């Protein structure tokens, strides 16, 4: 998505479709099998002026693989959720959100909708509350109870849901977790 914004912003492209999808094969009768959600989503980034306009962005690179699948494996594997939460999510997400808010000259209270992705439904709520967001008024639902863990499609699904509720001209925070954060 950031590359699409760059290409459209530079004038080299007028419209770019960005798509993501995931189907996670998990061990039978495992928590991963019960919580996995197959999904796909797409957004169009264009120069027509009717869509998103990025005001600020940040990236934090952190090679921590909470979930993975080897080429030779049939199913995804992952570290225990608490390990991923402490060593991955809690280290990078507050940093990237803080950088974006600072660059935009905004505070949590200024954000209309906050899309905060995460590897489980509780982490985004705890993070948002800790950073001063109104969890019931600003934070976008993670859709875990409806769609499950949609993996790579989660950021675009949540962005689409937030855009449906956002007021024109309002600020939207979009924070994505995976091998760091953006």
Report each predicted region and the residues it spans:
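General structural feature for long, well-ordered alpha-helical segments within catalytic domains
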Residues: 15, 40, 85, 89-96, ...
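Membrane-targeting and insertion segments and their boundary/processing signals
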Residues: 14-15, 63, 67-74, 129-130, ...
């Amino acid at each position: 998505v950031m590359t699409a914004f760059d290409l459209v912003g530079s004038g080299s492209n007028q419209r770019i479709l960005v798509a993501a999808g995931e189907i996670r094969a998990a061990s039978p009768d495992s928590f991963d099998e019960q919580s996995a959600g197959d999904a796909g989503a797409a957004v169009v980034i264009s120069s027509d002026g009717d869509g998103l306009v990025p005001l600020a962005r940040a990236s934090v690179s952190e090679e921590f693989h909470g979930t993975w699948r080897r080429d030779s494996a049939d199913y995804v594997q992952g570290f225990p959720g608490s390990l991923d939460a402490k060593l991955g999510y809690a280290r990078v997400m507050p940093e990237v959100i803080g950088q974006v808010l600072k660059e935009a000259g905004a505070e949590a209270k200024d954000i209309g909708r906050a899309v905060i992705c995460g590897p489980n439904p509780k982490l985004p709520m705890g993070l948002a509350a800790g950073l001063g967001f109104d969890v019931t008024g600003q934070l976008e639902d993670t859709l875990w109870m409806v769609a499950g863990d949609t993996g790579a499609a989660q950021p675009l699904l949540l962005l689409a849901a937030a855009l449906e509720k956002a007021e024109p001209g309002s600020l939207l925070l979009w924070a994505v977790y995976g091998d760091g954060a953006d």
